[in-house]
Amino acid sequence: MNLLRRHPVAVTLVVLLLLTAIHPFPALVDAVTGSAPGDADLDRPVLYVLFAPISDTLDALTFFSQSRAIWALTIWVLVLAAWGAVRASSDSFGWRRVVLSALVGPVVLVLLALAALVLPRPVPRLVSDGPGTVIDYHAHTNASHDGRPGWTLAKLAAWHERQGFQATYVTDHNVLYDRSMPAPEGASVTLLPGVEWSVYRQHVVAIGRVEAVPRDSFSESTARMVRMFSTIERQGGFSIASLPEYWRNHQEELGAFVVAGLDGFEIVNCAPKALAFPSDLRRQVISLAESHDLVVVGASDNHGWGAVTCVWNVSRPGAQGFHTNRVFSRPLALVQGDWQGWTAPVTQPWFMLRSLSWSERASWLTWVLIILLYRVFPRREGQTAGIGILARSIWRRPRTTPPPPPQSARL
């Protein structure tokens, strides 16, 4: 009890790490079957595992649906600010110290969120034992209006290469990539032609042989929009309905998509708005695709923000229709849509800890132990233990002169 009273955060974290190890998530889930694939896994770099508390936290901040991110960051900022203020006020510091202490936690959280968006770092890569090409069906460069500035074809290719992709379709918003631009020199990832058309309340990914289309003629109603699928087919291309638009805007009209000639559906998309896709609707779309022998795919939907993907595809050689593609997803991405946004401050850390591999879990426990020992044991004689040493270097207190001994002691 004394340890819990003195170090509640460390003890609580150790308990959570042990509890979540009882029923952990697999590293990957087949988004169609819901089971762990036996022929694919994630290869985690040494530095990723060594600094697992940072790596996993940045991943968890990346795999956030939009509504859950808003709830979690808001609540975490308020809790961290209140905690810092209470700790400082209990030590009878001045109001300036209380304010500064209240700001430390929120500032660190914001910096972590920014790091998740822009910081280059070690990331897991897919390793597949089965035949097939590891491919991404939906990714952007700075040619898209919402692409990260400076996010060139070379950077997009390098981003995919680090994570085990062998090929990716380049699908900028309403901008054709037809291989007329030279491929990045030395890139081992094959860049394939594609485009993402913005039409009536829907984004349509067209891949393969892509040509310009009169978008205005598909932008007034659903009935006119679905004609795009047959237009893409006549061009020799392949059409995929993108998330989250078909789920949010056309959920009751997906049958019309199929009748009009759609070739496939995204069932996992790493964009924050698309991560809220509920699993029951995903199963309905998978069932619809299977019954009509349509392709289902996962999409990083990368725009240059974030270092890591939540999904990979393995395209089977010689297969067609529904069995063309296998979709492997990080579990943390699949569970987002089944939980209300207000639960995110608690459920996101819980899901993150359940997602840890044994090597990552060992890294977490090691770091907790190191920090706990640093806080418990004094660094030199006469000095109190712990990170207080660092704190004293920042908030140096004035030294007090000991009172003179009593007169009787001098005699």
Segments predicted by a language model, with ranges:
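Charged catalytic cores and adjacent phosphate/nucleic-acid-binding surfaces used
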Residues: 1-135, 145, 154-155, 200-213, ...
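N-terminal carbohydrate-binding/catalytic regions of secreted carbohydrate-active enzymes
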Residues: 144-146, 152-180
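Alpha-helical scaffolding within the catalytic cores
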Residues: 178-180, 190-194, 245-254
